[in-house]
Amino acid sequence: MNYQILFNPYAGNGRGEAEAQKLSAYLTDGGLVYHNMTEIKSYASFFETLSGEDILVIAGGDGTLNRFVNDTDGLICPVPVWYYATGSGNDFWCDLGRKKEDPPVCIDPYLKDLPTVTVKGKRYRVLNGVGYGIDGYCCEVGDRLRASSAKKINYTSIAIKGLLFHFRPVHATVTVDGVAHSCRKVWLAPTMNGRFYGGGMMPTPDQDRLNTDGTVSVMVMNGTGKLRTLMIFPSIFSGEHVKKENAVRVWVGHEIRVQFDRPTPLQIDGETISGVTEYTMCGRMLPLQKPKISAVGE
């Protein structure tokens, strides 16, 4: 048996390959074959090289998983898929109750019938969630900084500076299963499949990615000034922001459409799309059995 390791060298601020090498401490019952994900041209061809006894292990972060689930959309992986977190945020890993450098686990149940989002006429599969508002702005600024410097990106600093000086709130229409809600002065409007995004923020603390109804949750933070928003913002890391009912609302549904009155950056699992005026996210349609998470050595 071989563990076929798909690693992203750019994950974890460029330490993806070195972090993936740590798998040798966990996967001791078979051979380890490493593949640079950025060099794979066709997953259909790659899957044909796998044998029935192989296990595919993805080593990367949330963006790595997003690329994998979208690059393999419509394909069936012939072997089990495991995951080992080597990213900087690791929101999916955190949602599973795992910690950095925990052993890899099988994630097949979490990749089935994923929610989809349509942006600018293109459909994407969504693992964690879609960020729209100042969170999308932060990803766009972070991308620019990453392109010009090797330093670690401080998204908290970007968010604070954005709140105070650069990002202007928008007016939005949020339509949940056909019911429209008008929202003025919107700072955040993410729709989530899991609980976490943005490196530990928890906009929808009650969202369950395997809920039997297949629903997703949208959180809107709006109607507040800069300083009030800045005071509320830190509580999003604990999920306590939802108690601020005069500033935060959460709706749950199968189809959620968010429209802004001007183009704003959007991010899907950390991957940025600029100049977006609306998106539509559809939840899962198939009921799933909740898996028991087990890892190497457990």
Predicted regions and their residues:
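Catalytic core of DAGKc-family lipid kinases
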Residues: L6, M37, G74-W187
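ATP/NTP phosphate-donor binding region
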Residues: M1-A59, N66, N70-L75, R98
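Short glycine-/acidic-enriched loop or helix-start segments at secondary-structure transitions
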Residues: G16, R67-N70, F92-C94, Y137, ...
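Glycine-rich phosphate/pyrophosphate-binding beta-alpha loops
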Residues: G131, D135, L188-T204
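ATP/nucleoside-binding phosphotransfer catalytic cores, i.e., glycine-rich phosphate-binding loops
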Residues: G178, L210, V220-E298
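A generic structural signal for short beta-strands and their flanking turns/coil linkers
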Residues: V170, K185, T212-S217, H254-I256
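Gly/Ser/Thr-rich active-site loops/lids in small-molecule metabolic enzymes
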Residues: R146-S157, G199-L227
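Flexible, charged surface loops at secondary-structure boundaries
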Residues: E48-G52, H181-R184, V250-V252, Q259
